[in-house]
Structures are given as C-alpha cells and as structure tokens.
Amino acid sequence: MFLELRECKARSNSVLEGSKDHKYSLFHTGGLLRRAEKMEAILMKAASFIAVIILGYGLRKAGFFKEEDFYVLSKIVLKITLPASIIANFSQAEIQPAMLLLCLVGFAGGVLYMSLGWILGGKDRDEKAFHILNMSGYNIGNFTMPFTAGFFGPTGVVITSLFDTGNAFICLGGAYSVASMAKDKNSRFSVGPILKTLIKSAPFDAYIGMLILSLIHVSLPAPAVSIAQLIGNANAFMAMLMLGVGFKLSGDKRQIGKIGKILSIRYGVAVVASLMFYFVLPLPLEYRQTLAVLVFSPIAAAAPAFTGDLKGDIGLASAVNSISIIISMIMITTVLIFVL
C-alpha cells in the first residue's frame, strides 16, 4: 500500500516537473520570438529611413534633382516640417522643470568636442579651427529627430528637442566663434552673432516657444495642433530625402588619415557617453534610451559651410560630414536593437 502511494507521488512529481519544464520552454521560446519580432521591426524602420536616403541620392544621380535642390529641400525641412513636428509632439507631452537639465547635456557635449578639437589641432591655427568646427555639434533636426520620433514617440521628441536646444548654441554659432578666435589671435568670442543666428532659426524658435507654453501649462488650439501633425508627419521623409540629395564624398584621398582620426575620436567618445547615459544615469528608461541614441548623431550639418567661411578645406569638411552620416546610421540602428 505504502509502495503504491510512493509510486503515485513520484509519478505526480514527475508530471509536475515536466509541466514546469514545458511552461519554462514555452516562456523562453515566446520571449525569443518577441525579441526577434522587435528586432525585425527596428531593422525594418531603420531600413526604411536608409532607403529614402538612397532614393534621394539615386534621384540626384539620375538628374531628377540637381545639387542646388538640396537647399530648397533644406528650407522646407528647417522652416516648415521640422518646426511643425516639434509643435505637434510637444503638444502631446508634459514638460517638467527638471527636464531642462537636458539642455545642459546637449551643450556640454558640444563643449567637450570643441575642447578635443582645440587640443587635436595642435599649434597650427588653421588646423585648430578646422578640428573645432568639424568635431563639434550634432545634426539632430535633419537626421536623428526622425529616428527618435519614430521609435520613442512624443516623449522621445521632447527629450531630443531639449537636448538639441543646448546643442544649438554650439552648432549655430558657438563653434564658429571659438574657431574664429583660434584662427585669428585678434578675434574675440562674441555672443551677439550666436543669439542672432538662434533667433532666426525656426526649429530653435519652435523649441523655445513650445517649451514656455508647456511650462506655463498653456495648450495650443486643437485645429493648430492638427495642422502641425499633418505637416510634421512629412518631416521624416523630407529630412531623409534631403540628406540623400545632398550626400557627396569629396576631398583629397591623401587626407584619409585626418578623416579617420577625427571620426574615430568623435565616435569613441560617443560610445563611452552612450554606455554611461544608458547604464549609469538615474533617469527613467525612455530618457536613457533616447540619450544613448542622441550621442551618435552625425556632425553638425553647418560645419562645412562654417569651414568655408573661415577659408578652410570645404572638400575635407564635406567628406567628414558625409562619412559621419553613414557611421551614425549604423551606430544608431545598433543601439536601437540593444536598448529597445
């Protein structure tokens, strides 16, 4: 009798253990499937952005777009679709005063890269000015914003916008003023031109305007938000198309070493910053995810133009800028796979 009871109990335990193993197996398999589906979704969305860039580049090569059409597309993005996207996404998010610290993070990143550029430029004033301009600043509005909007939604756009507000002081005049001072010992740092440039920047005006309205809890009328959403939805496509139309590689092949040095330091610092933001900062997950992506933004789009204004090597600056876009696409896609 006792032996029969023991055998029944043993069979029962065996069935229970088998059931547990089966449940664990199903749970583990389900988790892997969800992870694979998420990775596939990320790669598909990232691939769609890259496909639009390739489309723009192909259309320019085919003669559909001319090189000067880049400036027309740039005006549409910077003055219409990007400000509309900022307005639409800010209208869906709540801003806390503590979030303003993100502006300092964007500003600090620019200062760090300017400092590295100053050191790497050595004693040659032209080299110092070139490195300051072509290592600092982030191309966020034209490049990274579509990624953060597409993967992190309104909250991601707000975090990106606050980060870019601090970054704007660097890439829209700050780096140029410091580079001018480095090139000409008689030149002095001036805040006035930077502020004038910022005031004329439609995205920056949209950042500041929506930030103030959010902090004082004033909402835009529903029809205005609806129009902004309609226009803002085109921003990702227009920004990626613009990048494709404007993409070009030029410069002296003998200067590959200088390009490699600038980009290796730029992205080496970005890797360290991304890891620190994601694993160390005591912030909510979506903040850490967005910041981990933002630090891999390409070099500021205005850098080649500012380089030309200081009589620098425009071809080399354009090559550095274009290659940084390729690297950023790869790095941002990789980071998204790991953090989402």
Where are these regions (language model features)?
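N-terminal leader/targeting segments
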Residues: 3-5, 41
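Alpha-helical transmembrane segments of multi-pass small-molecule/ion transporters
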Residues: 20-340
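Short hydrophobic targeting helices and cationic amphipathic motifs
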Residues: 3, 14-16, 25-28
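Generic alpha-helix initiation/capping and coil-helix boundary signal
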Residues: 1-3, 310
